[in-house]
Regions:
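Glycine-rich Rossmann-fold phosphate-binding loop(s) that bind the pyrophosphate
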Residues: 2-4
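N-terminal FAD-binding dinucleotide-binding subdomain shared by FAD-dependent oxidases/monooxygenases
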Residues: 17-209
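Aromatic pocket-lining residues of Rossmann-like dinucleotide-binding sites
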Residues: 9-13
Length: 209
């Protein structure tokens, strides 16, 4: 699978294994987490703005320091929308989800426009257009399902040792003694990784004491 678990695993191990074959049941929308180290000056500024930051979090739906853009989508030019989306895509955290126009998650046309934009960014990051197309969901719009965040996930498919197998095209028929068999090909594998989830919320609490 290529949900939250798969996307994190693939991005992390692609440069550590000799060969990686990704068996994708269906693609998911995903955007960069954009994590980075915080400088001492930035940390000092954050501490100075604690009250402001917590006030924003208190106003937001999810408790994050992002508030939706208050402008009406139809009143904003295509160029201005693009500028906002570029800034949000390159920002850390959940900016593209939580600081966007309200209409992008409530109305079909704005959501389609945003989905097309994110698909364009995926194509820009994946060298092979056919692989990029297989990584783009066509059965739901951006933000319509829980969206995993990623670090270097799409770039992993530019590596010579990474291969994408779309199970929508060639479904798995069975697990074999040496790997697995799809409708078209037999794969010998050293390790079969089941990306079936993890304790995203409670795991850290379970480790206390």
């Amino acid at each position: 699978g290529t949900g939250a678990s798969g996307i994190q695993i693939i991005g992390d191990i692609a440069d550590k294994v000799g060969a990686l074959t990704v068996f994708q049941r269906r693609p998911n929308w995903s955007v960069p987490l954009n994590n980075r180290d915080i400088t001492e000056a930035e940390m000092a500024d954050i501490r100075h703005r604690y009250e402001e930051i917590f006030a924003v979090c208190a106003q937001s739906n999810g408790g994050f320091d992002h508030l939706p853009d208050q402008r009406a989508y139809q009143n904003v030019s295509v160029e201005e929308r693009r500028a906002l989306w570029d800034a949000l895509y390159d920002a850390p955290g959940f900016a593209l989800l939580l600081a966007n126009f309200r209409e992008t998650f409530l109305e079909a046309e704005p959501n389609r426009d945003l989905s097309d934009y994110v698909a364009e960014r995926i194509h820009a990051r994946v060298n092979d257009p056919q692989v990029a197309e297989k990584l783009i969901p066509r059965d739901h719009g951006f933000g319509m399902r829980r969206m995993p965040m990623e670090t270097g996930y799409f770039e992993a498919y530019n590596r010579n040792n990474v291969r994408l197998v779309s199970l929508l095209d060639t479904p798995i028929e069975r697990i074999t003694n040496t790997g697995l068999q799809t409708s078209e090909e037999s794969f010998d594998l050293d390790v079969l990784v089941y990306a079936t989830g993890f304790d995203v919320m409670t795991g850290a609490f379970d480790k206390i004491d």
